[in-house]
Amino acid sequence: MEEIRKTYVVNEKEREYIYFKVRFNRFRDISGSIAHEVSDKEEWAETEAVLCLPESYTADGDETQLVLSFHGAGGRVCAQEDKTGGVAYVPKLYEAGYAVLDICGAEPHGLTMGCPEHIFAAYKAYRYAIKHYNLSDKVLVMGASMGGHVTINFINTYPSIVLAAGMFYPRLNMDGVTVDGHYCIGTWDKTTRKDGNPSTKDRIIDIYRFPSEEWCEERTIGFNPYRVRSFINQEGKRVVIPPCPIKIWQGTEDVTVDPVMVQEFVDSVKRAGCYIELHMLEGIGHKTTPVMRDELVMWFNRFI
């Protein structure tokens, strides 16, 4: 498979970014057919991926630890446009000796919000990376903003390859959630169209293949982060059971991701007796800070 290599200056150092494309099967059997015939099929699509290797990388010897770093709604991966997706969020990771990988998504615009095809495509990119480079087959997973959807869905879909996850101001609920009388807006609630582009709600209807413009719980099963691997306990509280340790960084002044929703997700994981950490940052909005980047490295260092 052809690769494109580009060099960018990051933190006053030249870094090489390796772009490549992977094919994935985007078919989902949602027809409901009861005919006694093969209904599954291969519906091939292609997505672009980008990999950044640290200076310490070697083609033989010890494997380099791989991190999957998933971009948010404002990011994408595209060599032609010099877009590096979630790799751009975490320069301190490759400075610390980690390799970092992201994909565009199941559609060229990248705004696929953790839908099944996005997760399957990310796995294909992971397989390509560990096959062609001397990288670990157990991964650390990171996501920012809408990349929180992708992160949670990836670790739940492929738990056997994940060591731990970290997320910056993650979007965690597709549909709205009420916490102690406070309504936490879901991505489904975002109906505003900008510059002629589809709204977030429109994107969900498209990429999750809803049969109409009404919310369709069935089409989101397994890929709605707050509801995956979860149940309601006797007190009426949701209990979420993630497959690996998680740490989240969230600003108290974030108006894009509701801090109340993030706290509720953390509490729901703790109700399950699972390990999760939260660093709530006073006065910080929807942005990445040096504290987040420094602590992400420290968090991931615990698992290698």
Question: What is each residue range found by the language model?
Answer:
Residues 133-145:
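Alpha/beta-hydrolase fold nucleophile elbow
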Residues 113-133:
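Alpha/beta-hydrolase active-site loop
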